[in-house]
A protein has these predicted regions:
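A generic secondary-structure signal for well-formed alpha-helical elements
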Residues: 7-12, 16, 47-61, 100, ...
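Short, glycine/acidic-rich hinge or "gate" loops at secondary-structure transitions
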Residues: 57-78, 390-402, 479-487
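FAD cofactor-binding and catalytic pocket of flavoenzymes
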Residues: 1, 7-20, 24-27, 32-40, ...
Length: 487
């Protein structure tokens, strides 16, 4: 959709931060909370660069020389403002912001990789201003207003002589040297069914986070995590996103026009994210942002009805018709703490089309996250009830007590962990530079690096780390290949 967040400085040093603020015994033993091994200040130049690659729109809340009005007061200091001004806010998010402000909270426009003016990024890619067409969410942008890897990067580098993409190539495994200390390349399958070995001095694991874990496990890279002994690292600390929300229905005086939407259009508060609020007596770690967003009013997908409406029939049709123009949605986008019992491994029975064991996911919501979601959802519901012209509200919590995680209802695609970064090889797959402890010429990218998941969408943090890794690979490793940290 284009939500583009930076992590809070405390997010990247979570264990150290909570122990320093609340004491060494505050974090329970059933949570694998870890520091990332890299700080906000180290990543800030890379966050800034990536925001410029995407033509990000927003309002800065904290600059290096002090706070700014209208932005997120809890964010880390920025070296530069967003490259584009914030998006224009529709009725629903505006009313949410007004109610939040009256309650003493700090609303600001959602940071968006949706351009708000003509823009040329550092690679020379041109973006156009968003038209609020309502077909951004779950789709590409035909108007070139939403940041996209093809638009923002690929089109600018595809003609480089030292760049090539092998299309229709399925990587089957990473090959290792005889002593197992380095990778020698990858073996992939062509669309003609031919196995090809591609030698490489450096192997970058650039698949989606889950598939990086799978490829490592089937290739024998690193040490697989064993939940019984709690040893090994590949597949450890799998985490997700903890979602809740509130539906808000207005009287006929408020017309929200939901069909005028964009991927990352909305107003947010960060007052209950991370450790932006006192956790002393709450019984949980983490938090989440609360946002009122307006992405689309597509009739097959968007059918808001008040609580108690029948699921079908004439009364359902009447409720859809009467409420289509008078509805807003609040989202609680919560963190997800890693636990010893949530992990990824190879399935002992099922195999894929290439004869490899499938990846198996073992996950349920930790009690910590259930309590967090219930608390922050209560704050969202409080704001909803204080919005003007509201006739009814209804809340939902995917992590409610008594409900197990289900992969069936869409929540997010924010799968994290399994290839965690850090400074301790017994609890991380890669070091602080994204380099594998066990195979120094293998570098790993993506949200699999997160030791636990934040209350934000993962794109901004993972790309900040990606540019940090590339910087050290290019300027430190290539000239002298070696482990960049001692194990």
């Amino acid at each position: 959709n284009g939500q583009l967040w930076r992590p809070l400085p405390s997010d990247l040093e979570m264990r150290s931060h909570y122990e320093n603020r609340y004491g060494a015994d505050f974090i329970p033993d059933d949570l694998n909370v870890q520091d990332w091994g890299v700080t906000y200040d180290e990543l800030e130049p890379h966050f800034d660069f990536y925001e410029r690659i995407c033509g990000t729109s927003g309002t800065a809340g904290q600059m290096a020389d002090g706070p700014r009005e209208g932005g997120n007061p809890f964010e880390g200091p920025r070296s530069a403002d967003y490259p584009n001004p914030p998006m224009r806010q529709p009725i629903g998010p505006t009313k949410f912001g007004e109610a939040a402000q009256k309650l003493g909270y700090h609303p600001f426009p959602l940071p968006a990789a949706n351009a708000t003016k003509e823009y040329t990024n550092p690679y020379g890619a041109k973006l156009h201003p968003c038209t609020y067409c309502g077909f951004c969410e779950r789709f590409g942008c035909g108007y070139y207003a939403k940041a996209d890897p093809i638009i923002c990067v690929y089109d600018q580098i595809k003609s480089h002589e030292n760049f090539e993409i092998r299309y229709q190539a399925q990587v089957l495994r990473v090959e290792k040297s005889e002593d197992g200390k380095t990778a020698t390349g990858v073996t992939y399958l062509t669309d003609a069914g031919e196995e090809v070995f591609q030698p490489a001095d450096i192997v970058c694991m650039n698949a989606y986070g889950l598939w990086n874990v799978h490829l490592m496990l089937v290739s024998g890279l690193g040490k697989p995590y064993d939940p019984k002994t709690r040893t090994g690292t590949v597949g450890r600390n799998y985490a997700y996103q903890t979602m809740a929300g509130v539906n808000v229905f207005f009287d006929d005086q408020v017309v929200t026009n939901p069909f005028m939407g964009a991927g990352a259009l909305g107003t947010v508060i960060d007052d209950f994210n991370g450790d932006n609020f006192d956790h002393s007596d709450l019984g949980f770690l983490g938090g989440g942002y609360i946002a009122c967003t307006q992405t689309n009013g597509r009739p097959i997908n968007y059918q808001p009805t008040p609580e108690g409406t029948p699921a079908w029939g004439a009364d359902w049709k009447r409720a859809v018709r009467e409420n289509y123009l008078h509805h807003a949605s609040l989202t609680v986008h919560g963190s997800s703490m890693a636990t010893p019992d949530n992990y990824l491994d190879l399935d002992p029975t099922w195999k894929d089309a290439y004869g490899r064991p499938l990846l198996r996911m073992t996950f349920n919501f930790p009690e910590n996250d259930r309590r967090m979601a219930d608390y922050v959802m209560g704050k969202a519901h409080e704001i909803a009830r204080n919005m003007e012209n509201v006739t009814s509200t209804s809340a939902s919590n995917r992590a409610a007590e008594g409900s197990d995680y289900s992969i069936v209802p869409y929540q997010t695609t924010h799968n994290t962990g399994g290839t965690v970064m850090g400074t301790d090889p017994t609890t991380s797959v890669v070091n602080r530079f994204g380099q594998m402890w066990d195979h120094h010429n293998v570098f790993v990218f993506g949200a699999g690096l997160f030791p636990q998941n934040l209350g934000y969408n993962p794109t901004g943090p993972l790309m900040g780390v990606a540019y940090w890794t590339l910087d050290h690979m290019k300027n430190d490793y290539i000239t002298n290949p070696r482990p960049l940290m001692d194990a």
